[in-house]
Each structure stands twice: as structure tokens, then as C-alpha cells.
């Protein structure tokens, strides 16, 4: 699985066990990603932060 890094032109091959791509954004600025990469379990979104996870690089 390859996921995009914070700089969209670059991607990263995920290590074994981390089989989800994720994108973290602030709710106040939803179009600006704060963090991107590979993750094993999708964190819960909170009042300030929104997480978007999927098993392809389409969401991040």
C-alpha cells in the first residue's frame, strides 16, 4: 500500500501492519491537511481535528 505524504507529490510505502492511509485536518481549515501517511487504526475525530481513513491512497 502506498499513501501520500504531506507533500502530495511524494508517496510512502506503508510498513507491514499499517494498512490504512489517513489524512488529518483541522475542522476550522478542512481543505488544509495537517498530517498524512500510513496508520494501523483510524483515530476518532474530535471537536478540533478530523481524520479521514481508507484502504487506498484516494482519500489522503
From Swiss-Prot:
Xref: CDD domains: TFP_snake_toxin
**Name the UniProt record assigns to this protein:** Cytotoxin 5
Q: Which domain of life is it from?
A: Eukaryota
Q: Name one GO biological process term.
A: killing of cells of another organism
Keywords noted in UniProt: Cardiotoxin, Cytolysis, Disulfide bond, Membrane, Secreted, Target cell membrane, Target membrane, Toxin
From the UniProt annotation, give the residues forming the signal peptide. Answer: none
User: What does this chain do?
Assistant: Shows cytolytic activity on many different cells by forming pore in lipid membranes. In vivo, increases heart rate or kills the animal by cardiac arrest. In addition, it binds to heparin with high affinity, interacts with Kv channel-interacting protein 1 (KCNIP1) in a calcium-independent manner, and binds to integrin alpha-V/beta-3 (ITGAV/ITGB3) with moderate affinity.
Q: In which tissues is it expressed?
A: Expressed by the venom gland.
Q: How does it assemble?
A: Monomer in solution; Homodimer and oligomer in the presence of negatively charged lipids forming a pore with a size ranging between 20 and 30 Angstroms.
Q: Name one Pfam family in it.
A: Toxin_cobra-type
Q: Which GO-annotated molecular functions does the record name?
A: toxin activity
Name the family the entry cites: Belongs to the three-finger toxin family. Short-chain subfamily. Type IA cytotoxin sub-subfamily.
Q: Where in the cell is it found?
A: Secreted; Target cell membrane
The UniProt entry, under Gene3D superfamilies, shows: CD59
One CC-aspect GO term: other organism cell membrane
Q: What is its main location?
A: secreted
InterPro entries for the chain: Cytotoxin_Cobra, Snake_3FTx, Snake_toxin-like_sf, Snake_toxin_con_site, Toxin_cobra-type
List the disulfide bonds in this chain. Answer: 3-21, 14-38, 42-53, 54-59
Amino acid at each position: 500500500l502506498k499513501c501520500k505524504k504531506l507533500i502530495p507529490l511524494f508517496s510512502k510505502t506503508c510498513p507491514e501492519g499499517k494498512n490504512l492511509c489517513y489524512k488529518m485536518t483541522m475542522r476550522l481549515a478542512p481543505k488544509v491537511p495537517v498530517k498524512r501517511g500510513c496508520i494501523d487504526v483510524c483515530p476518532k475525530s474530535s471537536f478540533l481535528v478530523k481524520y479521514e481513513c481508507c484502504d487506498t491512497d484516494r482519500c489522503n
